Design a protein with these regions (language model features):
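Active-site loop segments of alpha/beta catalytic cores
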Residues: 1-106
Length: 106
């Protein structure tokens, strides 16, 4: 995604979703926000495999906080995973993600 990020940003889409870290390559919310600017909606890329499968509430909360911080205050942002949830993700991990998001948005 990195080599194509500026091209993607130039297309003028209203929003952009991007994949979670894979094979040692991570695309941060901050990197995408810099390319797309403060007015377009970004869809976060929390790691649904490593992060949520570990089911560590504090780690999940910290990851949510970091994505929110990187997106920027008042910039449109949808907190979500960067790929589908595996079948074995604990529901408690999903709840931790939702509760963390609510604590920043409400």
């Amino acid at each position: 995604i990195r080599p194509l990020l500026q091209l993607e940003a130039s297309l003028g889409t209203e929003g952009f979703a991007f994949e979670q870290p894979r094979k040692g390559r991570a695309t941060s919310v901050a990197m995408v926000r810099r390319a797309f600017g403060p007015r377009r909606c970004l869809f976060g890329n929390l790691d649904s495999e490593a992060l949520l499968l570990r089911n560590d509430r504090e780690e999940i909360r910290a990851a949510v906080a970091e994505q929110m911080r990187q997106s920027g205050e008042a910039a449109p942002f949808v907190l979500c995973t960067g790929s589908p949830l595996p079948d074995n993700v604990p529901l408690e991990a999903v709840d931790a993600m939702v509760q963390a998001a609510r604590s920043y948005c409400l």
